[in-house]
Amino acid sequence: MTEPNERPHGPAPETNAAVLDAKGLRALAHPVRLQLVGLLRKHGPSTATRLAERLGVNSGTASYHLRQLGAAGFVEEDAERGNARERWWRAVHQSTWFDDPELAEREPEATMAYLQSVAATYTLRVQRALNELQTMPRAWRDTFDMSDWPLRLTPEEASALHEELRAVVTRYRPDTPEGAATAPDGAERVSVITHFLPEPDATSVPADSSGPGSGSGTEAS
């Protein structure tokens, strides 16, 4: 699996980030495309054949999705590496940002497809870590964590908590070429994934409210 460096929501894009518009949103609304972008961002330029092997798909499928990503501006051909027999691709950006409520309103189906693709990608990343956990050095096994804390918050409090957590994470060294160059011995990639999952109770929503969150659901905690 891959690390797509997706930020479905965020207050401000970082340097060299793709800020999604309608075209980009639709282009990334597919798990394979998210994985392809993630592989190119993590490992650098590659070919459709090599990427297909990593993802367990055929090279034709990988080539098709790479062309779609290229048309949307997420990847581009690496002319310095390519030749007449093989096309090499590289990522254009290091991360993706999506924080446009108006766009989400205009493109509800594409928005949901994109978010579902991100969620599926995160699930596979967790599963990969679990599969590799027993073979990790003990020091790294001891850092592994999956936790959840059910809270009762207002929307304003939830937003404030999100900002506080983001501020904590950004104090640490990012997984970028610059970060790798200054990292001490023993530093490895660590993925920190956050989920804020509103679960409004049906009885707590005003009678005239509608839309996501106004119905009942199944308790998970």
Give the positions of each predicted feature:
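Charged, low-complexity intrinsically disordered regulatory/assembly segments
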Residues: 135-221
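Pre-recognition alpha-helix immediately N-terminal to the DNA-recognition helix
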Residues: 34-38
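N-terminal leader segment of winged-helix/HTH proteins
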Residues: 1-28
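Short, cationic-aromatic polyanion-contact patches
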Residues: 26-32, 47, 76-102
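Glycine-centered, phosphate/nucleic-acid-interacting loop/turn motifs that mediate DNA/RNA or nucleotide
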Residues: 73
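A short acidic, leucine-rich amphipathic alpha-helix
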Residues: 50-53
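Amphipathic alpha-helical dimerization/coiled-coil segments
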Residues: 90-150
